[in-house]
Design a protein with these regions (language model features):
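Surface-exposed, hydrophilic segments of mature proteins
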Residues: 1-119
Length: 119
């Protein structure tokens, strides 16, 4: 599964180094400030039975798109690459001085040999 974690980070410049904040995350609520354009064929879990989707997503109870998990639903062979998940990401908020936007991607997987043991 994959989760996108959008953050603003203080730049690695002299002023931020002097203030001892270079590289640190800016404390900011990102809800409603990030737009994702998903690849073709990425569908909501509820409609996954209707298509031949490789990626499905499951919304969180909060409804915040930044809390959404994406699942690749096919096993990959060693060296094989999954279908594309994300085409584009846009940050729509204000950037505080000496900061930049980062999209951190958290990914987890299981070995194909473990599939028989999944419940």
């Amino acid at each position: 599964r994959v989760r996108f974690v959008p953050v603003l980070v203080y730049d690695d410049n002299e002023q931020n180094k002097k203030d001892n904040i270079a590289g640190q995350t800016v404390p900011l609520d990102m809800r409603g400030k990030v737009d994702y354009i998903l690849a073709d064929g990425v569908v909501a879990e509820a409609s996954s039975q209707e298509t031949e989707a490789k990626w499905i997503y499951k919304d969180s109870l909060s409804g915040d798109i930044n809390d959404r998990y994406y699942y690749y639903i096919s096993a990959l062979e060693p060296g094989e690459v999954s279908e594309m998940l994300l085409k584009e990401v846009t940050y729509n908020g204000e950037l505080p001085e000496n900061t930049h936007f980062e999209l951190r991607v958290l990914a987890e997987g299981i070995a194909k040999a473990q599939l028989p043991y999944l419940v």
